[in-house]
Amino acid sequence: MADFSHILATRPDFDDEDREWLHHLVADWQVIADLSFADLLLLVQNGDGKYVVAEQCRPSTVMTLRAEDVVGNVMPDDMVGELDAAMLSSVVFRSTVLRTVGKATVCNVYAPVRHNGKTLGLVVRETNMATRESNGRYESESINAGKQLYEMIPRGQFPYKDSMMSQRHIARVADGFIILTMDGVVRYAAPNAISCFRRLGLLTTMPGHYLSELGTQLLKAVSYTHLTLPTTPYV
């Protein structure tokens, strides 16, 4: 069975930096899948020029479209035309054809993976159109945040240089997320994010406040609590 490293090995034109970038991408792309409520596929062309699924990412926030392992699968011939067009694009490329995966109607969007002036492959965002019906504020904010991260891929801005997944016990989208303005003001906080801050002792509302100031309030509250705790002499 083909795996990620073996598939990349079919491309001798990829240098170490190219491979490292792709490994970094699949280490960090879970957040995009979760925010977007969508499956992600990384496609690269193998030594024969065929588009192959090099890696896949299932969302943890919605039922996956891909219960089976599709790594190593060759993309069908009827998709080659739009895949070639997406590879030549400098921005996100949207398919004009709805496809069927299982029993779901799916819209494909392609993000060319750009790095050091080269297009290494495509990240396919497979969206089940049924998940776009009757979305509320939470879903809309989540999808928009995922879209912004996804659109950074062709610009070479995602993944970040410093890995997001390097920490142990990393929080996931389902634990809550916060949307900030360019100035660092909270524009939206997911319900679970608000609950986390409440448990830490935050009493004010979050939207409209600088996140840094909210954090400072919590630090001051913790410091005050420590100062007022009775001290026990060591025996």
Regions picked out by a protein language model, each given a short descriptive name:
Residues 39, 109-110, 176:
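Conserved beta-strand and immediately adjacent loop positions that scaffold enzyme active sites
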Residues 42, 112-113, 179:
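Hydrophobic beta-strand positions
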Residues 78-141, 195-196, 200-212, 217-227:
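Sensory/regulatory domains in signal-transduction proteins
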Residues 1-77, 89, 98-101:
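Non-catalytic regulatory/interaction regions at protein termini and inter-domain linkers
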Residues 2-36, 129-176, 220-224:
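PAS-family sensory modules
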Residues 226-235:
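Single conserved hydrophobic/aromatic residue that forms the stacking wall/gate
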Residues 40, 201-205, 233:
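Secondary-structure boundary/capping signal
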Residues 45-81, 141-146, 159, 165-227:
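PAS-family sensory domains
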